[in-house]
Every structure is written in C-alpha cells, then in structure tokens.
C-alpha cells in the first residue's frame, strides 16, 4: 500500500489503496495478454512470468528477473510502456485478442510489428476473439464498493474460462499457435470487427485512486463448438481440393473393403483423417508481436481432407511430445528435420510450403506413409522420454534417415552376452527375448505386424505396401521408395536403441528359439527386460524346455542335450510359486562354489519326471577368469553327472546326516543377477560371506557363510527336496554383529527368545532401552516347508522386518508424517507428538513425565527441572510429602498474577517448543481483507499442579505484514484457524468485535476465553450459586488475545501479534463426562481505548 501522507484528507483517501493506479492497469493488461501462455502440458496453458500472483497473501517463491534476451520480457516491457502512456493521457485502453492463419503468418512469414498491424491483409485474415476496454470513470461513492483485488480475481476467472483457454486445454497447448494481442487506444476507428455478434461482460468497478475508478468490459466471440478453419487471403481456393478429396475417399472405401478380405487385422487409416502434430523444439509461446515469437516451427493445421469436416479438437488426433534429454538433442533435431521435410498437408494442397507437390497426383499410399512416419517419430520421442537418461543412446548423432542395410521388420532381435566365454561353452540354443515395440512403433498392414510365427514369409522390403496389400498406382514413385526405405531404417534403429537403452537387457549371441504356437501371437507376448525380477527356473528333460504358465514353448535342438548357464537369466513374468524379487547390489565380488557342490541350472521338469531343485549361477563382471573357468568345469561335470541322481542325493545326505535333503540357498539381493549357492557340507563355502543359517536342532554347527557389515540386503532361502516346494525367507535389513552368534548353540537362542518375550510384556510407558536387535523373534508362516525350517532359530533372520523398529527410538520411532525430519511419535506412550494436543499418560511414579525430546537449548532455563523423581528409586521420598516434579512448588514460584497472565506476558521461560503449527487469520465486515496464513510459534511450560499438562501457547507475529499490521473492518468478525503440523484443525477462534467508536491513533485489546463447563441438569438454583460453582469447576480450554490500533485516518489494524492458549488435553479424552464449551469476550472498560505511544 501507499505510505501515509501528512495531509489528513489525502491520507484518508490514499491510505486504503493497495496498488498504484498505473501499476494496477499494467497488472490487468499483463494478466490478459500472458494469462493464457500456451505450454505443452495437460492444462495446455500457464500464466506468464509477469502476471500478478494469484494469492497476494503468500509471497512468490522465486521472483522473476526480466531479461532482454527473452521475447516475453521484451513484450511485457512494451505493453507496460503503452499502457502507462495511454493512462497518463487519460485515454481508454483497448486490448484485442485475435487468431491468425498458420499458413502465411508463421515464423517465416510476415511479422506483425510496426506498420504490419495496419496491413489490410492482416485485418482481413485475423479472427477477433476478445476486445477488452479499460476505461477510467469518476470515483464511485457509497457504502458498497469493490477492491482492486476483487477485479483482478474476476478478470483472472474470465481469462481462465475463456474460449481460447478451452482450445489450449483440449489440445494440450497445440492449437491455436498464432495468437496476436494488440494494445491500442479504444478508438472506434481502430477497432476490428467480429465475425459474429459478440457477447459483452462488464466487471465490477473499483476505485483505483482518490478521484478515479476503473471500468473494465470485454466483448467476446460466442462459444464455438468447433475450432475455426482460418484461411488467409492467398490460400482460399479450396473447392478444387474438396472435389479431389471426395474422389479419394471413395477410392479408399473400396480399398478398405478389399483389405478386409486380405486378412489385415490392423485398423485401416483413412487418408482424410486429420492429424495435428507439434514439433517439440521448445516451449510453445504466444506470438503477440513478431519479437515475441514462438520457439517452434509452425506446421500446417489444414486437414488432409476437404469434406467439410471441422477442425474439432475432439475429432483430431493431436500428438505432442517433448525432447527427452539434452543428450538426445542431435538425434532429435535430425528426426524433426526429417519430419519437416514433408508437409503434413496432402500432396494436392498447394501453398507456400508444399508447392513442390503436384496437385494432380492422387496417391493414397503417400498419405498413409506420411502418417505412419509421423506416428513412428512421435512414438520414438515418447520412448526416449521414458528411457533411462543415464543410458547412452545409440541413436545419438545418427539421423533416422540414414540409409542402412537392415531387414524391414525383424521378428526377433539378437543381442550378445556380456561373457562370451560362457556362450562358447554352452552347447544349447539360448532363448531370445522378443523386443517389445509397443512404446516405440506401431505400424499397419502386413509388413508392420510383427508376428511370432516362423512359417510366415517376410514381405519384400522393396515392394511398396498399402493397406490392402495390393500394388498401388505409385509403385514407381521415388518418393514412395524413399519413404519405405526410411521406415525400414527407423525400425532397425528402434531395435538397436531398445537393446542398448535398457541396461538390464541381456545380450544374446546365438540362434533364436523357434516359437511354436497354435494361434498367431504378436510381438507383445513377453518382454526381456530384467528391471526388477530374476526368476528361479527349474529344468526339465534336455529335449524340451518350457516356461511355466506360458502360452508358448521354446523348442530346442534335440541333438544338443547339454545344459548351459546364461550370464543373464531369461525372466518372463511368471506368477507361479517360483517368483522372487532379487535386487542388484553393485561392486560385490562373487566367490563361486567348488565343482563338488551341486550347483545346477534351474528349470521346470515335466510332470512325469522326478523334479530336481537347481539354481542358476550367474557371474558378474567383477569375477576373475579363474572363477569363470571353475564354473565352466563345474557345469561340464554337472552335465555329465546329470542322470546320476542317486549319487548327488547320497552326497548331500552325507553332509546333512538326515533322510531328507535340505539345501541352503543364500542369495545376495542383487539388482539384476542372483548368486545362488547350494551348501551341502561344512567348510565348503567359507569364502562366501553370507548370513548364518541353522538347519536342525540336533546339528550344532551347519554350513556358515559369513557376511561383512557392508552387506545390507541378504535373502535366505531354504528348499526341501522331499516336499518339492521351497520356503523362502528374506532378510532385508542391515546385518550387525553376526559373528557374535556363530558359536552359540540352540539353547542360548531359546533363552534369548524367552528374554524377548519378557521384555515385550514390559510396561508400555517405559522408554525402550538399547536392546540388541537380534533378541527379537518373528512368527513364521506355517506352510509345507515350514516344518523343516523351524530349526532356523537365528533371531537375525527371524526378526528381519522389525529390526529397524527396535533401535533407539530417537532414530527410528520418530516417524515423519509429512516427509520431513519432524519427530512424530513419543517412545513411551506411542501417541503422535505433532497431532492435536493429547496429554501424556501417567507413569507408576505418579509424576508428569518430562518429554526431553521437545527440549531446546534456546528455550531451556537453568531453573527448569530436567528430570523426574522416581519414588521407587528414591528411598527418602517415602517419608516426605511428594511434590510436583513437573514444576517447582508454588511457594518458590513468584508469579505476577495467575498463570494465564504470566504466560501471556512472557514472564515464564518456556520448557520446549513445538514447530510446525500454522494459523489462518481472516476478518469480515464491511469489507473482507485477504486471509493470511502465518506460522505460529508454539511453546509449553511447567505447571505446579501434579500430573496436569501444561497448555500450549502460540504466538502469531504480524510484523511480516508491515509496521501497521493486518487491516480489519471497524466492526465485524475475526477468525483465526489454528492448524497443527499435520494440517489438522486444532481450534477455530471466532471473535465478534465493534470498534467503530475507537478514535484515531489509539489502541485497545480483546481477550476471548473458552471454558469447558460441566452440564448441570438441575436448573433450579440461584444465579449466585450457579456462578460460584461455574467459577470453581470450569476449566480454561482456549484463549485468544487480540491487539488493535487505529491509524491517523481511523483505519483499524490488528498489530504486533496474536497470542493463543490452547490445551494439550483433547476434549475427546473426557468423553465420559458431560462438558460444554462456553466463550466469554472481555475488553478494557476504564478506559476502553488508550492513546498510542
């Protein structure tokens, strides 16, 4: 607001206005011109940098600094100068919003700067949407008046729901793109005409200065059901093209009927279908003048048919996409240039950008190929957005239109294994994942369908293909050949990019499996991305391999029966019993087991064969070559001994000394690969550092694989061959001090479990001490394999999920409810610290426990007690009267007045501070000021009454609003809503006041107390007796203290601060008693107002 002036009359008139008149006019003009800036988003538009903030109560997070390099800033500066010049000369201001055709008014076309605005061609071609008139009028007088911010809100609402905003929202910022804003004097001769009779809206008239008010009106074009087709004065001959389009539609209709007989399952595209596409070279900006140009290249938005179809956005196919990252700029710009090399309009439409096309040609294949390439490029951009930004794209620096030798539609894309030595040793054909092209490409016709049937012949890549599979009239056209070749190059590059884009994709260098199917299956059957899962598989006979619960089978060569170990497992998404989520952990060296161990590949066997439990062993790049050769020797030995089931079983039995074979599979949770080792005798895998597993109660020492402290995630899996169903136990928390438990027997673990149960039954108010997290237990699910896994008594494994909760409560029990590091729960009571005030429970000592977690050094007084007295631990306390431990005795506490006055006047040192409270302050009366959201500093104190919780005190500082404070009406209602850190309402204070008699330069205060009074059913009593009982039994629940002052002109302000008292004890706690809340408002009486200092 303006500063107060010396003159009393001028001060009375000028003090109220929040804006200068010129600044307010500029804000309105910028809101009209920048309030609908197009952008590529769901909303489709945004407010520019120079628009006034929507909520003046909250300051903007980042203040925009104008730069001459930005066209939007230059245009805003020009608009500001024009508006201020017209306003100072007392000339009404006119802002016109219009659309221009896209054909001749693009970035390469004529600009609209300077004299071009007066060009008759522009006036003829432009479509006027809105005409705003900002006119100064004499000052409005009367009791009912409008503030400036009210007009701003009304104009913002109109702009938000305007026709232009609706078009931008439907098209996600694509159309319209050539938007022109013209600021000029509101002269009748300068006004452009509407194409239809406009509708007029007049806004409320606020006073903007001591003698001038502002009248704002807008005339707008009626709502259009369809987007208008704008044509310039040059390209208006459309009748010829309509005739040609009708002939094409008839021709395509006959072709579509023939295509159904040809068996093409893909939907037929009509060449006359509209397709609007936006090139993502940058943010879509509004073109107000030629300097404020958009950063994209304008494309033709004419439909490719002239059948009278509208440019309705609901019927149009609008595809907007952005560049994925800066690293993809080169390839993206090349794709954009390739896309721009051919116009989106049909080859028969002659304009300045497509004049090289012959208007006499009628070739539907060109239109379909153009549309297909358009969709391919759009899907490439979508895929690049979702691609891993850290992955180096293969297509970077390689344009899509480069000619390369590649198959048109490969059925399966091969890759190479990272470890080629394993591939050479493996004699079995490895399954090849089919690349999922759903996010990258979608093609129609026989060539575009990627079938998984090996018997399906490939189409001739040189033969042009149309929608019905018949040769068209344009076979010999070189444009068709170039388009087909370009499409094949795009497909090949998509495949290469997909292989390298996913860092988890395995590289297969071998013959792909022949996929046998009873029905045609598209390429979207399964994906070979191993992002989150590596699945354990079981082996069947060497002659056939089948995936469980899959609709296809992978047939391998019967002549090669040896098993191989792929470096990266094939992971079809199975929902069977073998699903396990195994995460990759980098830089972990894997030590392979000896060849004598039964480490085997895991696949499914057929139902008529005896099932074996095998596991895949995967090597990482950090493994040395000795380990790889050792693995290969082991695999060969395992393959040669594959039939000898009895020998393997006997060997395992010798180690386990039991009738049934029990295997330990301790799997490090890797992100991509798993290291699954099978331990069958003691001391075999002592180099592998993993968690300890205890097998049987009678077995004192089993195979132990130690894990270092740096390993955070290990997974324990126990598989039982008799039941043939593995029971998997996972450990997801950090392992600490595993070595302490290596030499403890089964009885010690039983004693530990008993101690845990005893501690768990302890009093809930006792603060948890530093218990060893290994001493807790966890119930195991009772399943088929759980009987044999009961012997796993190691509490490190059994209490895996609860380890993070049993640490010190200061680190783990404090949960963040709002995503910050704010402490939320109390260790003793378990109650939320940041919710609505709730008292702490009493302990057995009978004293009010001090919450040491809320103590802060800046608020902690040396006199404040910091510990509680425990009667049971203090032998001298039994013979003495017990005093309050939460506050000193009343005799030693020198209070000036009662507790309420001492707290409100800051005579007591706070015991602690609770951060995160906020309050919304508002007022209503003859006018409604802006509601302000302000922080509240909340503290609590020590009290003298035993076990009585201290009320909270909150202080709302108003100094941030200015030296005068928060302006309120002379009389009305003040509303203060208090929120806790969880944004839950604690209390809503409503205070009714009347300060119309308050003179200027005076001050006063109001205090409202809210008491909880017991409800009395007996009404027959004297008034004096009732008042005396109420004063004795009523409890103060809430209090608000308001300070008021008046300025020299008599305006009323809330100044300095607002002080609150609210109880920590919620009313719901005393739900058993019948209480009601009663409020009393008090103010000074003699004198009621005092002069300002």
From Swiss-Prot:
Keywords: Nucleus
Intracellular or extracellular location(s): Nucleus
GO CC field: nucleus
Ranges for region Transactivation domain 1 (TAD1): 29-37
Region Required for macropage invasion, annotated ranges: 895-952
Basic and acidic residues bias: start-end ranges: 746-763
Region of interest called Disordered, as start-end residue ranges on this chain: 396-479, 558-579, 746-788
Principal location listed in the UniProt entry: nucleus
SMART domains for this protein: DUF4210
Segments of this protein annotated with the region Transactivation domain 2 (TAD2): 979-987
UniProt free text on domains: The protein contains 2 transactivation domains (TAD). Each of these domains may be required for transcriptional activation of a subset of target genes.
Family: Belongs to the ATOS family.
Stated role: Transcription regulator that syncronizes transcriptional and translational programs to promote macrophage invasion of tissues.
Name of the protein this chain belongs to: Atos homolog protein A
Organism: Gallus gallus
């Amino acid at each position: 607001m303006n500063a107060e002036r010396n003159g009393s009359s001028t001060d009375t008139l000028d003090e109220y206005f929040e804006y200068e008149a010129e600044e307010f006019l500029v804000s309105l003009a910028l809101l009209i011109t920048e309030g609908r800036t197009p952008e590529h988003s769901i909303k489709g538009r945004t407010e520019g940098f120079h628009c006034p903030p929507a909520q003046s109560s909250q300051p903007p997070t980042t203040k925009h600094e104008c730069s001459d390099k930005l066209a939007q800033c230059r245009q805003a500066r020009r608009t500001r100068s024009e508006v201020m010049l017209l306003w100072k000369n007392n000339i009404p201001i006119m802002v016109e919003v219009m659309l221009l055709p896209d054909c001749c008014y693009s970035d390469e076309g004529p600009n609209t700067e300077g004299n071009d605005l007066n060009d008759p061609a522009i006036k003829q071609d432009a479509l006027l949407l809105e005409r705003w008139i900002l006119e100064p009028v004499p000052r409005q007088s009367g009791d009912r008046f409008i503030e400036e911010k009210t007009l701003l809100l009304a104009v913002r609402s109109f702009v938000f729901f305007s026709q232009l905003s609706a078009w931008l929202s439907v098209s996600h910022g694509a159309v319209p793109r050539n938007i022109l804003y013209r600021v000029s004097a509101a002269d009748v001769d300068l006004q452009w005409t509407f194409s239809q009779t406009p509708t007029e809206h007049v806004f409320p008239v606020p006073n903007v200065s001591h003698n001038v008010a502002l009248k704002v009106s807008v005339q707008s074009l009626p709502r259009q059901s369809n987007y208008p087709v704008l044509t310039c004065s040059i390209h208006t001959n459309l009748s010829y093209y309509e005739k040609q389009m009708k002939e094409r539609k008839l021709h395509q209709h006959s072709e579509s009927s023939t295509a159904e007989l040809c068996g093409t399952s893909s939907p037929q595209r009509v060449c006359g279908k509209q397709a609007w596409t936006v090139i993502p070279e940058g943010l879509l900006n509004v073109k107000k003048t030629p300097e404020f140009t958009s950063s994209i290249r304008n494309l033709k938005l004419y439909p490719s048919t002239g059948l009278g179809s509208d440019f309705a956005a609901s019927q149009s196919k609008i595809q907007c996409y952005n560049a994925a990252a800066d690293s993809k700029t080169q390839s993206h710009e090349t794709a954009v240039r390739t896309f721009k090399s051919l116009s989106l309009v049909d080859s028969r439409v002659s304009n300045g950008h497509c004049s090289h096309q012959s208007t006499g040609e009628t070739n539907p294949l060109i239109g379909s190929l153009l549309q297909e390439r358009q969709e391919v490029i759009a899907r490439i951009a979508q895929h690049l957005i979702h691609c891993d930004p850290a992955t180096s794209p293969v297509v970077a620096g390689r344009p899509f239109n480069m000619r390369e030798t590649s198959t048109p539609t490969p059925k399966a894309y091969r890759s190479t294994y990272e470890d080629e030595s394993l591939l050479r040793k493996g004699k079995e054909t490895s399954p090849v994942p089919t690349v999922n092209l759903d996010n990258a490409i979608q093609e129609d016709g026989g060539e575009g369908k990627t079938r998984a049937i090996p018997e399906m012949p490939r189409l001739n890549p040189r033969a042009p293909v149309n929608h019905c599979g018949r040769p068209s009239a344009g076979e010999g056209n070189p444009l068709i050949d170039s388009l087909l070749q370009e499409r094949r190059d795009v497909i090949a590059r998509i495949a290469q990019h997909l292989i390298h884009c996913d860092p988890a994709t395995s590289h297969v260098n071998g013959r792909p499996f022949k996929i046998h199917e009873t029905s045609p299956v598209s390429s979207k059957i399964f994906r070979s991305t191993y992002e989150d899962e590596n699945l354990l598989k079981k082996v069947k006979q060497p002659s056939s391999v089948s995936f469980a619960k899959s609709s296809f089978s992978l047939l391998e060569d019967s002549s090669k029966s040896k098993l191989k170990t792929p470096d990266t497992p094939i992971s079809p998404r199975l929902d069977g019993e073998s699903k396990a989520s195994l995460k990759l952990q980098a830089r972990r060296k894997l030590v392979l087991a000896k060849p004598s161990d039964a480490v085997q590949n895991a696949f499914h066997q057929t139902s008529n064969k005896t099932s074996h439990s095998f596991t895949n062993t995967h090597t990482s790049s950090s493994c040395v070559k000795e380990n790889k050769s050792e693995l290969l020797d082991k695999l060969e030995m395992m393959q040669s001994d594959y039939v000898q089931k009895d020998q393997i079983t006997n060997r395992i039995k010798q180690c386990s000394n039991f009738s049934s074979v029990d295997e330990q599979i301790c799997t490090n949770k890797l992100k991509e690969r798993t290291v699954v080792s099978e331990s069958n005798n003691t001391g075999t895998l002592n180099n592998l550092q993993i968690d300890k597993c205890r097998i049987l109660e009678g077995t004192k020492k089993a195979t132990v694989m130690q894990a270092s402290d740096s390993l955070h995630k290990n997974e324990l899996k126990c598989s039982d061959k008799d039941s043939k169903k593995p029971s998997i136990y996972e450990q997801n928390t950090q392992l600490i001090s595993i070595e302490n438990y290596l030499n403890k027997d089964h009885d010690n673990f039983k004693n530990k479990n008993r101690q845990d149960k005893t501690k768990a039954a302890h009093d809930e108010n006792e603060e948890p001490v530093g218990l060893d997290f290994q001493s807790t237990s966890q119930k195991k699910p009772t399943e088929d394999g759980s009987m044999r896994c009961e012997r796993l008594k190691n509490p490190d494994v059994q209490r895996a999920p609860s380890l993070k909760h049993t640490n010190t409560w200061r680190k783990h029990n404090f949960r963040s409810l709002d995503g910050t590091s704010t402490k939320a729960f109390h260790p003793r009571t378990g109650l939320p610290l940041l919710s609505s005030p709730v008292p702490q429970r009493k302990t057995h000592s009978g004293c009010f426990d001090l919450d040491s977690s809320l103590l802060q050094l800046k608020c902690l007084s040396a006199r404040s007690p910091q510990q509680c007295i425990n009667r049971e631990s203090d032998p001298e306390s039994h013979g003495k009267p017990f005093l309050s431990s939460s506050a000193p005795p009343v005799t030693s506490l020198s209070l000036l007045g009662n507790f309420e006055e001492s707290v409100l006047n800051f005579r007591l040192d706070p015991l602690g501070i609770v951060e995160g409270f906020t309050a919304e302050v508002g007022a209503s009366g003859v006018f409604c000021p802006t509601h302000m959201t302000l922080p509240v500093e909340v503290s609590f104190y020590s009290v003298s009454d035993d076990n009585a919780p201290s009320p909270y005190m909150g202080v709302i500082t108003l100094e941030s609003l200015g030296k005068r404070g928060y302006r309120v009406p002379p009389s009305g209602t003040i509303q203060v809503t208090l929120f806790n850190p969880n944004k839950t309402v604690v209390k809503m204070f409503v205070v009714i006041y009347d300060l119309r008699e308050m003179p200027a330069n005076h001050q006063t205060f109001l205090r409202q107390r809210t008491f909880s009074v017991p409800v009395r059913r007996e009404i027959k009593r004297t008034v004096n007796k009732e008042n005396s009982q109420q004063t004795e039994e009523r409890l103060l629940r809430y209090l608000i203290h308001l300070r008021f002052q008046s300025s020299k002109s008599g305006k009323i302000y809330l100044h300095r601060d607002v002080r609150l008292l609210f109880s920590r004890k919620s009313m719901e706690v005393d739900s058993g008693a019948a209480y009601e809340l009663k409020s009393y408002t008090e103010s000074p009486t003699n004198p009621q107002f005092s002069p300002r200092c």
